[in-house]
């Protein structure tokens, strides 16, 4: 089994938040939980958090997918928190934090694109749930008619 603390450490490293200043432990754990559910749904796995471990053991590629999706969830949380930021100035100094929400949103979009690309490599998409059977021609017969061979 993979320790949850190992995955959380990887996630915090990817976020650039090793000290836990951007998101609290509960927020990061929530992102990890949501990520595991999304990965299970998208690639057909059965991972779950059981106490302090993730069972069954995460393989290398699946662990990367879980961390990538959790990173996107964290960006969504940070975008929501940054949406209330404002711009202010005093004299010749100005502080503008209004673009933080957009920056987190852009990062979230990039991470989700990478996640979807990785999922498509594992589970190729099916075109509108239709099976491509290639060059098939239907045979049409009329009842009661004889057909001569040519």
Protein language model annotation of sequence segments:
Residues 1-60, 121-150:
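Conserved short "hinge" loops at termini or chain/domain junctions
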Residues 52, 90-92:
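Intrinsic-disorder/low-complexity loop/linker signature
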Residues 60-79:
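Elongated alpha-helical scaffolds
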Residues 84-89:
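Short, surface-exposed beta-strand/strand-loop-strand elements in extracellular ectodomains
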Residues 92-102, 140:
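Eukaryote-specific, cytoplasm-facing alpha-helical/coiled-coil scaffolding segments in long proteins
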Residues 99-125:
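Polybasic, proline/glycine-rich intrinsically disordered low-complexity segments
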């Amino acid at each position: 089994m993979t320790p949850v603390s190992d995955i959380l450490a990887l996630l915090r490293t990817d976020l650039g938040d090793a000290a836990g200043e951007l998101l609290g432990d509960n927020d990061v754990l929530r992102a990890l939980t949501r990520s595991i559910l999304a990965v299970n749904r998208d690639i057909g796995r059965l991972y779950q958090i059981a106490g302090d471990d993730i069972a069954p053991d995460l393989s290398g590629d699946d662990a990367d997918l879980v961390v990538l999706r959790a990173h996107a969830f964290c960006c969504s949380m940070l975008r929501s928190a940054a949406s209330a930021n404002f711009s202010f100035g005093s004299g010749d100094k100005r502080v503008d934090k209004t673009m933080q929400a957009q920056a987190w949103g852009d990062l979230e979009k990039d991470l989700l694109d990478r996640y979807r690309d990785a999922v498509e490599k594992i589970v190729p998409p099916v075109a509108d749930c239709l099976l491509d059977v290639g060059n098939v021609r239907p045979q049409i017969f009329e009842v009661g008619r004889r057909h001569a061979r040519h």
